[in-house]
Amino acid sequence: MNDENRFNVSAVEGESKKNGIHMGANIITRPLRSSVENVERGVAPNSQSEGWHHESGWKRRRSLAQLTREALPRMENYRNSKRALKRPSLGELHGDHLITEEDEKDQNHRDTKSPTPAVGIKLGWIQGVFIPCLLNIWGVMLFLRLSWVVSQAGIGLSLVIIAISAIVCVITTLSMSAICTNGEVKGGGIYYIISRSLGPEFGASVGIIFAFANAVAASMNTIGFCDSLNDLLRSNGLKITEDPINDVRIVGTVALLVMCIICAIGMDWESKAQNFLIAIIVGAMVDFVVGTIMGPKDNSEIAKGFVGLSSATFVENFKSDFRFSEKLDQNFFSVFAIFFPSVTGIQAGANISGDLKDPASAIPKGTLLALLISMVSYTLMVLFAGGGALRDASGNITDLLIVNGTVTDYSSVSLCALNNTCEYGLHNSYSVMQLMSAWGPFIYGGCWAATLSTALTNLLSVPRLIQALGVDRIYPGLIFFSKPYGRHGEPYRGYVLTFFVSLLFLLIADLNTIAPLISNFYLASYALINFCTFHRALVRPLGWRPTFRYYNMWLSLAGFLMCVAIMLLVHWVMSLVTFAIFFTLYLIVHYRRPDVNWGSSTQAQMYKTALSSAHALARTGEHVKNYWPQLLVLAGRPQARPALVDLGNLISKAGSLMIVGDISQEKLSYKVRSARARSDDEWLRGRKVRAFCSRVHGFSFEPGARALVQGSGVGRLAPNVLLMGYKSDWTTCPANDLVSYFNVLHTAFENRLAVAIVRVSGGLDYSAVVSEGAEEGAAGSLTATSSSGELRVRRDGLIMHADSDLDIRDTQPKHNLSNLLTLTTSRSFTISECKEKDKKKKERKPNDMHRQIVYNTASGLELSKFQLAQMSLFQKKQESGTLDVWWLYDDGGLTILLPYIISQRSAWANCKLRIFALANRLHEMELEERNMANLLAKFRIDYSSLTMVQDITDPPQPETKALFDETIKKFTEESASPDCRISDMELQTLAVKTNRQLRLRELLLANSKDARLVVMSLPMPRKGSISAPLYMAWLEMMSRDLPPMLFVRGNHTSVLTFYS
């Protein structure tokens, strides 16, 4: 197929073609919607719903939009804009209820946080990329330092310097073009490219460095303009002050201010100025080439070193001649550092990408062409300067050998180099090009045009880069400077900031001091651009489809390494400073964690790494040395049982998997599920809990828990421990609920999961605080009031829901109720800690500190300080105490491992482990204790004491037995539900075990009543041998009136080993 006709669609021939649509032979007309559907779409029920209408005796067909809810593929459906069209959601097409709200994923996908400023002048590739790149490349070095580079490095190494610079720039341009053509590029230039490719940390860091480099480059070019202007004035006997440096500062400040005003006026004025400046520069370069070909016009020019093109001069100047110059012993890399800023204009088009009509096409085309032309021009000027001028010249005509008015020997004019008294020549004068030109004043105009045009381009790009950073809210300090003004959205505040930054470096008034500084900054930026392309091409996310094909992944990597190597070779100290600045800015953004999602390649790499790691982990055999408890926490919504989630986090913190299971008996719409997911994830992040939430809906507790147990996780990343709360209402709940709870334990054991049950005083369930209105992004409100009128916290408009999505920082005064932990009253009295006050505080007047503060929810539930403290029981710092472990039965070691993990956390570091174990033979007590101590030593578990329990078989006290009988009385009656009835036969059969549990209660009360946490082996509920109420009665007796209790039963595979 001919490529030219590749995208042309031929018309369909035939008589059955109407209105450009090929019609079949048979047309069936039928109603396309029911009356209900018509009403939903705003069509009257009695309106005609046929596919054809008769009007004025002719047929017309209804449009497709009237026949279907479906949306056709349109560009507007994919735009990241609030004004973009929105295709029908899946819920609308499927017929779900509650579909009026856009999916959160789609809202995040739309770039609402990075709005583009008001639309201004849009430029094509010539005006927007080609000319700005040429002007930026043809900068201060073109007329003021290129001849000096030739004098130091010689023609040969000068061409090498140009070649290395060209290679770096070409590779970077190819990399930049690949990124720019992988979708639409908005305003922000280099920052936008890198941030959307590698993420906000890299993009913002390089963006700040690049903006700073451009601001300093503007001052550097302004200094070049001032130097040239002052040389012209002084050559004519004019001066502003006695000090040339002050002249540079005065003229530079005025010039900088005028250029900022020109840029702030708008793109159209700046574009008109560029066209004028580019014409002057090209004319000055032609003037230099013509003058060099013509040769010296008089003997004074020969005496000043301009001898005309000759092979002898070319050969003499071909080799290098590095000397002490500019307060430094020059070498190849120091000269390279001075020259490199003259080729750093390749980003000029990308910097104003938001002002381009078609950035994806304009940036590659304009940049590469500008780079080609500028490198050719630099090469020609090096060849002409090196082939037509001497390195040293005295300027004295008397040093010339003149015969019959013709100079026959000019070698003597260079003898001044022996005593360093030469004032002219490539080494000593920056005005060589003016000397070699056909008309000298034109070179001054070209120099001014080159310097001012580059400064204009830099000054134009910096405010827009700052604006992009501010709009994205990466660095809060830049938000103030990003405000757009006028119909073109000009960042006037950014121009003011740019002016003062450039002015600060303008006051240095030394071009050669500034050039190496910005060379490192530009090289760092180019290195990141190349790394962006390499990383994206390496990861190859599905979204990586650049239309620019002339790039190579390994070439981009080579460009990255080359930039870093050149940075270190040019000035290693400044390179380290640049790296330090970059990583500081990187860490600031990383610490702030901006809420952005730009689909960067680091995210794609994260996904690929996680996937490959999960596959590799699945192929790796399990080993006891690598065991970690991976928890499935049946907490419902995490806000409802914060203490249970905190305990799970205490065990799995930053080391293993934790999944919070949420079971809902109602069938929830997608909208409600999404709102719950957002609310739960935000709550977990706010509480600094690393966990995943897994939700099932439309199931009762037992089948929902079974689904979570069997379906949670992937590969080896699957739960191996089920953590759940103790059912404190087991004596009053419906029989089905009690049986379901008990059956979940059997389900866990059937799937070979370990089980852990936690009980705390007052219970774990605070779901009454969390209302069911999660789809509105809010839960039951929690407010604090005081019994004293003076210390009131509740105010109108400050009722905050427990899991509200509202940003509390936007309310005044600031009450952080999002995690239900912290509340500060008007007297700065913090309730979150709930610690005991010392004696001095207790002695204060009751009116001062002993007010009773009560927390009220929307449902009227009151929470005391004690209840609030219980909600944060496993989160707050524990005072000195003990962590008692009753390791009664060998379950593989999990019962001893979990408390050891807890004791290693900083919040529980003050709690010492006390181990309680059962003795098998009373007459061998000492031997049993020695064996247990030896086992613990081999496991390398530190403990403060070891107690062997020897009277476990003693009968319980009568009052203990009476308490047990009272507990199970309801379930032994004839009227009890058959599923929850404890028969006399069961009591008799399990009498020995029951007495053992009752005896354990007495031992626990005697030894562990003051412990911070008690961890105990969970009795094994043998399937078919024990009923749910009797088993719960065992747990009730062993945990009532005791500190927080954690029952643990491992899956009887070893989780500890004493082998290395």
UniProtKB/Swiss-Prot annotation:
Subcellular location: Membrane
Membrane spanning residue stretches: 123-143, 154-174, 198-218, 250-270, 276-296, 332-352, 368-388, 432-452, 498-518, 563-583, 643-663, 882-902
Family note: Belongs to the SLC12A transporter family.
Endpoints of the signal sequence: none
Molecular function terms, GO-annotated: sodium:potassium:chloride symporter activity
Designated name of the protein: Bumetanide-sensitive sodium-(potassium)-chloride cotransporter
Residues carrying covalently attached carbohydrate according to the record: N396, N404, N419, N816
Classification via NCBIfam families: 2a30
Any Gene Ontology CC annotation: membrane
Spans within the Cytoplasmic topological domain: 1-122, 175-197, 271-275, 353-367, 453-497, 584-642, 903-1060
InterPro entries: AA-permease/SLC12A_dom, SLC12_C, SLC12A1/SLC12A2, SLC12A_fam
Any single Pfam family the record assigns to this protein: SLC12
Membrane topology, from the record: Multi-pass membrane protein
Keywords attached to this entry: Chloride, Glycoprotein, Ion transport, Membrane, Potassium, Potassium transport, Sodium, Sodium transport, Symport, Transmembrane, Transmembrane helix, Transport
